């Protein structure tokens, strides 16, 4: 953040200022468990927490000023009193985005948005010829708190911002996209994910479409031609220009998949170029097209795209390859899962000439359709004919049932079952590939990294 005085902050937030007008801050904090020293502390309040209980702690740890909803007479540092500290956090983030005014892109989708974010940021780092000139979302900071905190990291050095928007209920993206004000916005795909919050696939379509409401006046709406719901999104897109990836504007041909990634010819409005992509799977070729569309709409060239896509390294938890031995490959795709992303990962696994093992955990937040969706995955696995499926969790049991696999209620038991089986395959000089996949709460990486540590062949 740039340096601001408490009187400037009061004006931006339309807050009542109590205390010194000239205290200067350039750091934001919302959590006393992290470094609060020399920061402006926002006392956020939610259904299950209230940071107003920790004001004394924030001050004792070095907070220079506080943003609060109620004045506290015992506090010695300046207080900025607002009606809602969460909204105030967003207002400050919006003000800073407008002040710095970087070329900004935003993406959402049911899966792949983090990979698209990483790819886009990599491309734009080449456009800027400076990795420090590109701000991008860290981790899962993609909700109504994380997005403002991301924007509040903006400084005058930033020329580009790449912001990921997530949601598990209606109107969440409607709020965050209006803070971000993207010059280009993209929906990567639509799938049955977070159905407990959205209610139905139609609810997902509507919620993701909210991203286009925040577009700047000349902003571009980018749509996946394979997930085109323009009839529903037309109101949000209004008079904005529309481009398509996996379609007429950005596409791929001559696609070849290898154990290290993919090669393809990228087709774009700027022309064609050969890409060697260090990401596994057909779906990541599509993610690369999405990233290209976003980056080109804020100034990237074909040369930037090639450099950015080819130099980006794999990300743990997202089809991250772990070559344990020449004959044993573990695929860590454990960050999260929905039906489409799971089937995409299975497509990668089926392409290996090896003994192919799927270790799958439950897909969460699917509501009343959860068991049916898990069964559909089992039916899909039957079509691709994997060698072994091991499941863990309550609902993934139906996947094992559908494919005559093995179900476990304990991950340690799964590992203990797999270790001798895999070692036996390796002793016969056979290749083995193990894919781990499941929703974040299932922590299927426990299985993958235990196998890495325990297999001795």
Curated annotation (Swiss-Prot):
Keywords: ATP-binding, Cell cycle, Cell division, Cell shape, Cell wall biogenesis/degradation, Cytoplasm, Ligase, Nucleotide-binding, Peptidoglycan synthesis
EC number(s) per entry: 6.3.2.10
Main subcellular location: cytoplasm
Cross-referenced InterPro entries: Mur-like_cat_sf (IPR036565), Mur_ligase_C (IPR004101), Mur_ligase_C_dom_sf (IPR036615), Mur_ligase_cen (IPR013221), MurCDEF_CellWall_CoF430Synth (IPR051046), MurE/MurF_N (IPR035911), UDP-N-AcMur_synth (IPR005863)
GO biological process terms on file: cell division; cell wall organization; peptidoglycan biosynthetic process; regulation of cell shape
Keyword Cell division belongs to the record: yes
Gene3D superfamilies referenced in this protein's UniProt entry, alphabetically: Mur ligase, C-terminal domain, Mur-like, catalytic domain, MurE/MurF, N-terminal domain
Pathway(s) the chain acts in: Cell wall biogenesis; peptidoglycan biosynthesis
Taxonomic superkingdom: Bacteria
Disulfide bonds: none
Compartment(s): Cytoplasm
GO molecular function, one term: ATP binding
Pfam families: Mur_ligase_C, Mur_ligase_M
Enzyme type, top EC level: ligase
Similarity comment: Belongs to the MurCDEF family. MurF subfamily.
Protein name (database record): UDP-N-acetylmuramoyl-tripeptide--D-alanyl-D-alanine ligase
